[in-house]
Structure formats: C-alpha cells, structure tokens
Regions:
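Sec-dependent signal peptide recognition
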Residues: 2-9
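N-terminal targeting leaders only when they are immediately followed by extended low-complexity/repeat-rich tracts
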Residues: 8, 20-23
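Intrinsically disordered, low-complexity Ser/Thr- and Pro-rich stretches
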Residues: 3, 18-19
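Hydrophobic h-region of N-terminal signal peptides that target proteins for export
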Residues: 10-18
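Asp-box/BNR beta-propeller blade signature and adjacent active/binding-site loops
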Residues: 22-174
C-alpha cells in the first residue's frame, strides 16, 4: 500500500510536466538564434569545440577550433573567434587568435577578469601530425601542451601564446 501511495504521488506531481503545456514568465525575452560558424566558411572545413564568454563591456566572444582540411582532431587547426557587440544579433568577421602553421591549437577556455576586463584564453597545442591515440599511448612526437593568451582590448587583438604546461599539467596526464 505504501509503494502504491508513493507511485500515485509521483504520477500526480509529474502530470503537469507531461501535459504538454508550457508556461513563460512575464519578463521572458525571446531568444535570438544565429549561425556563428558554418562548415566551409572562410576556407575552413569544419568548426568544432565552441566556447563563449561575455566581456566586461558586454561584447559576446564566440571561440572555436577552425579545422582547415577535415573534421579530424589531427592536422592544421587554428583557434578563431567572432565578436558580437549587440548581444549576438550580428557577428563580426573571423579573428584568428592562434595559427601555428600545421599544428593543433585548440580547446578554447575563455575567462574574463571582471575587475580589469582582461580576457584570458586557456588553450592546448599539439603537433599536427600526432594522432589522439598516439598522444594517449605516449608514442606521439610531442605531448599535448597548455598555453594562455590574453586580450586587453575586448577581444580585438591577442597576445602571443605563453606555455604554462609545467605549472598546470601533471606528468602522468596526456
């Protein structure tokens, strides 16, 4: 009997969720959608690993890996971004944050210092000929390394990458 009461109570509580009715708060704003990165645009085969952040000035920065020749994790991969100064309604041209010839610059992780406005971008690098399985097996030419870049002008320009691998990556990590 106790189990029946519990199941009945759960069904009664779940009923409004299953009714198909949706409620919208009075102050809800409509969501605007936009395609920021599209396969084949700007000479890149594929864009992956998106990351977004809103700057102290309110600019939306949308980072991605721009994969030049395929969607593969190996090869010539650049870190790019697009900026929006109107909350995401329109987007500026692609800005290349980091291009290291045929190597992999990826995994963007942006952070904004709310006091100074500086945008920090953590990222990884690996040799463009190294495959993921080889990196994990520790048979690759090089290892995956960690870098930081920064912008003090709301994402318009970026510092050169500075390697921080020894201070953030344990020896047993790939």
């Amino acid at each position: 009997m106790k189990l029946t009461n519990i199941i009945t109570g759960m069904l009664l509580l779940a009923a409004p969720c299953a009714s198909g009715q949706q409620t919208t708060p009075q102050d809800a704003q409509p969501v605007h959608t936009a395609t920021i990165y599209k396969k084949g645009d700007n000479g890149f085969d594929t864009y992956r690993i998106p990351a977004t952040v809103r700057t102290k000035k309110g600019t939306v920065l949308a980072f991605a890996e721009a994969r030049k020749h395929s969607r593969s994790d190996t090869g010539d991969i650049d870190l790019v971004l697009r900026r929006s100064t109107d909350g995401g309604r329109t987007w500026g041209d692609i800005i290349t944050v980091w291009d290291d010839a045929g190597n992999v610059c990826g995994n963007p992780a942006p952070v904004v210092d709310r006091e100074t406005g500086r945008i920090l971008l953590l990222s990884t690098w690996n040799d463009g000929t190294d495959h993921e399985k080889d990196i994990h097996a520790r048979t690759a030419k090089d290892t995956r390394r960690v870098f930081v870049l920064y912008s003090d002008d709301d994402g318009l320009t970026w510092s050169s990458p500075r390697e921080i691998t020894p201070s953030v990556k344990r020896e047993d990590w790939t």
